[in-house]
Amino acid sequence: MRILAIDTATEACSVALWNNGTINAHFELCPREHTQRILPMVQEILAASGASLNEIDALAFGRGPGSFTGVRIGIGIAQGLALGANLPMIGVSTLATMAQGAWRKTGATRVLAAIDARMGEVYWAEYQRDAQGVWQGEETEAVLKPERVGERLKQLSGEWATVGTGWSAWPDLAKECGLTLHDGEVSLPAAEDMLPIASQKLAAGETVAVEHAEPVYLRNEVAWKKLPGKE
């Protein structure tokens, strides 16, 4: 099985290839340079893996949430590549991707993901890894004010890992929440961590045709555009 993963939904730009169990990955912090970097990174990963695009079984893309511009860039480029090679596509949540990263780095199976969404809000989710290694919690994804996060936390108990830029942007996000929190060691999503999720989705037949690949913004785009200078 070969899966190519692409993510440009945040300040990071990353590409990874699952090549029959071997992973090759590249991750860069490159704000506002996604369009210049992503295709060269794809070419570098394919060359390093000795694979061509026509040998890929599916193309995974970071479907958001994240920067509107970044999410659109990633999906547009992924669609172009998938169309040219006639590949099925797999949308992967940026929040679930970070949860997978926390598991890879720390073994965490319960993860609170928060991405700074600007405008006084965070993109939020509570993910838990089940016995089959599948992340459950997509229904918890939302864009929330910090005080609403506090309300969500009061409904939880036990130990959780924290991931994402939302925690540094809002240091008091979990103030007096009563939970045991530890650092999941992930600030931004990486394509490498999309691959296990994408492989599960591919095995389950959860792919979409190129024309049906859609972003998940969690926020109304019109409301975002009312603020000048924001992506």
Curated annotation (Swiss-Prot):
The keyword tRNA processing applies. It comes from the Bacteria. One of its GO terms (biological process) is tRNA threonylcarbamoyladenosine modification. Pfam families: TsaD. GO terms for cellular component: cytosol. InterPro entries: ATPase_NBD, Gcp-like_dom, T6A_TsaB. Keywords: Cytoplasm, tRNA processing. It is found in: Cytoplasm. Required for the formation of a threonylcarbamoyl group on adenosine at position 37 (t(6)A37) in tRNAs that read codons beginning with adenine. Is involved in the transfer of the threonylcarbamoyl moiety of threonylcarbamoyl-AMP (TC-AMP) to the N6 group of A37, together with TsaD and TsaE; this reaction does not require ATP in vitro. TsaB seems to play an indirect role in the t(6)A biosynthesis pathway, possibly in regulating the core enzymatic function of TsaD. Neither binds polyphosphates nor a wide range of nucleotides on its own. Does not show O-sialoglycoprotein endopeptidase activity. Has been identified as the first Gram-negative bacterial RPF (Resuscitation-Promoting Factor) capable of reviving VNC (viable but non-culturable) cells when added externally, but the million-fold lower activity as compared to Gram-positive bacterial RPFs may indicate a lack of physiological relevance. Belongs to the KAE1 / TsaD family. TsaB subfamily. This is tRNA threonylcarbamoyladenosine biosynthesis protein TsaB. It comes from Salmonella typhimurium (strain LT2 / SGSC1412 / ATCC 700720). The gene is tsaB.
